[in-house]
Amino acid sequence: MSVPPFTIRPAAPRLDGPTGPVAVAPGVHWVGALDPGLRNFDVILKTANGTTYNAYAVRGSEGVAVIDTVKAEFAGDFFARLEAVARYDEIRLIVLNHLEPDHTGAVPELLRRAPQAQVRLSPRGLPMLRALLKDDFERYDIKGVTTGQSVSLGDRDLQFFTTPFVHWPDTQCTWLAAERVLFTCDLFGSHYCDGRLFNDLVGDFRFSFEYYFDRIMRPFRSFVAQALDLIEPLDFGIIAPAHGPILRSHPRDYLTHTRRLISSRLAAETGSEKTLLIFYVSAYGATAQLAQAIHDGAAESPDVRVSLFDLEGGEITPFLDLIEEADGIALGTPTINGDAVRTIWEMLAALVDIETRGKLGAAFGSYGWSGEAVRLVETRLQGLKMRLPEPGLRVKLHPSAAELEEGRAFGRRLADHLTGRAAPREVDFAEIAAR
């Protein structure tokens, strides 16, 4: 199948990801796709870090099951990863936990390549699959399944749990007891793209997890509560959602977290790690390059959790809880008409509603003529009682290789200030004004 190439917007940071499948558990592989450039999902939801379309292959002694697929534009990535772990004639089962297009874009072609496969989904999903396949629907072994039913792969079974309206009528979960993996599709998902895939390896995605819940699951919270009741007795060790990080570290915490989100927000903790959030807006990609370099430098510290956000793709309000809990923030902006861009000022204005006193602050950006934006942002950060241990970093036009290294060094210094490895220092108003 011919799939058009996908090009990331120049202003978006490119997150390196796996080129092949990724082992999730014995006999279980991630075969999905990364979409780091996505900035708006389903019209209603901004995606500052893009998203992932998680699909999985499960191997048993008598065949392979494929659980969900990907958005059509990324079918090529999906098939390449799937072919690395299975032949098409080995595919015995295709499980569709949810029929939304971002999970079924490769289904027609997958069935063409593996026509012998059984297709199992919730009964409410049958009309939607018929609409997707049109006249081809009758060609395949397609059946609805309900809670408690299962399909054997020989030495392991996949059991189904009907969880309607989480967030479509057709949604279900699939349980692999042999490896304690629960495939939940949109439940426990988040629009957060990070090529490291697992929740114990990626950046801080709490904001995305909660924002996703607020925008997608909250209108169906009574159904979410019923779904949690249904799956809570399972002894799962991994939650494998269809979007965002795979939850292999303390997965039950996310169930508890979701219960709390049904009625109230959860103030999560990051343990002994320090957290640095980097927000930026980029006109021609130069500030984005600088932001990525600062991120990479700071991320070299094992004691600092660093997250990078493109504010062009996100609303500001969902970030406020995250900023309030963070130890430091760095803001990047180009200089346009002698000023920082509007989105950065909107974020700075929103910070008056949260506690910022004593947090580490920093500013950076590219410019063409005068370069006042960094200085103006620094002044406002000081007005918010944040501490600025490093003078802001400015680059004229696009950064050179040497200037990108300066960005990485800037990030390393910010991390050192957060962890106490650097001597305390405070940039004062006179130093800012002098620039």
UniProtKB/Swiss-Prot annotation:
One of its GO terms (molecular function) is electron transfer activity. Residues 276-415 form the Flavodoxin-like domain. Its EC number is 1.-.-.-. It comes from the Bacteria. Fe cation 2 binds at residues 102, 186, 243. Keywords: Electron transport, Flavoprotein, FMN, Iron, Metal-binding, Oxidoreductase, Transport. Residues 48-228 are annotated as: Zinc metallo-hydrolase. In the N-terminal section; belongs to the zinc metallo-hydrolase group 3 family. Low-potential electron donor to a number of redox enzymes. PANTHER family: DIFLAVIN FLAVOPROTEIN A 2-RELATED (PTHR32145:SF11). Homodimer. This is Type A flavoprotein fprA.
